UniProtKB/Swiss-Prot annotation:
Protein name: Aspartate carbamoyltransferase catalytic subunit
Gene: pyrB
EC numbers, comma separated: 2.1.3.2
Naturally occurring in which organism (per UniProt): Maricaulis maris (strain MCS10)
Pfam families: OTCace, OTCace_N
Family, as annotated: Belongs to the aspartate/ornithine carbamoyltransferase superfamily. ATCase family.
Gene Ontology annotations for the cellular component aspect, listed alphabetically: cytosol
UniProt keyword annotations, A-Z: Pyrimidine biosynthesis, Transferase
The protein's annotated pathway: Pyrimidine metabolism; UMP biosynthesis via de novo pathway; (S)-dihydroorotate from bicarbonate: step 2/3
This protein's record includes keyword ATP-binding: no
InterPro entries per record: Asp/Orn_carbamoyltranf_P-bd, Asp/Orn_carbamoylTrfase, Asp/Orn_carbamoylTrfase_sf, Asp_carbamoyltransf, Asp_carbamoyltransf_Asp/Orn-bd
Amino acid sequence: MSRAEFSYDFPHRHLLSVADLNPVDIQIIFERAAHHLATNRTPDKRSDVLRGLTVLNLFFEASTRTQGSFEMAGKRLGADVVNFAVAHSSASKGESLSDTARTLAAMKPDIMVVRHSATGAPQFLADHTGLAVVNAGDGMHEHPTQALLDSFTLSQHWGSVGGRRILIVGDILHSRVARSNIGLLNILGAEIRLCAPPTLLPSDVDQWGCDVFHDLDEALKGCDAVMALRQQRERMSGGFVPSEREFFHLFGLTHERLEVASPDVLVMHPGPMNRGVEIHTKLADDPERSVILEQVESGVAVRMAILELIGANIRKEASA
């Protein structure tokens, strides 16, 4: 698709939180993502929608799927994509986020994709750089593009997630993926269940509008989809579970456990995946149940949609 052919009314310059989106915004993203998903399965994957724009990937935390997905998304849309190596930057020498932001903004990129360990870092950059900012994960706060690709993946199977019963199991406490998914699924009208040991649930979880379980077999009953989350040991300062073996015994997903779920239950994982801890390897690789690789494929398409829509707004501003 060329720039001249693209026209969608998406009223956002940034994507910082799923709370900024309404059902119409989400539908627009999903429509564009479906287009890109189909195009990405053909030999001719590229367009010039973002030609002349620069996307800066600024990842202060390690990433494989998300950074690679954003890089591929930008390049397939014709953008110039720059991956900023934070480990070799002045930020690693003690430079403040504010100074890093001003320095990068002076280079005149158009869209900044940011992952940072500090909650609110993408919002800070949006407020202080004048650039369009996409949140690729900030601390334990949010990961909006992951939530969008997760619901998009499910919508490809069901048409809509509204009214579906979806379980998230694992380390809810430290998970920005869980927080963004809960926010988005609530907007879309899904029934959300959470399952974890008490030590891996936030103290205010009773205010999240979800049904909370500590027994996985009870939580799985009648579920249409279940998402396993890894233990985020890099954010843990103590022992939250006795051992990985005990965690798998109580909360690990297996084929046997899924027998109480919906007959067509789908299994998800945002990655990185610890086989034999939160999910059995046979279940993770089961093409009848697992949509984990579909999530990865959807990630490129959804991020293409987001960059495309934000890029269109940047061009509108420039021509106004």
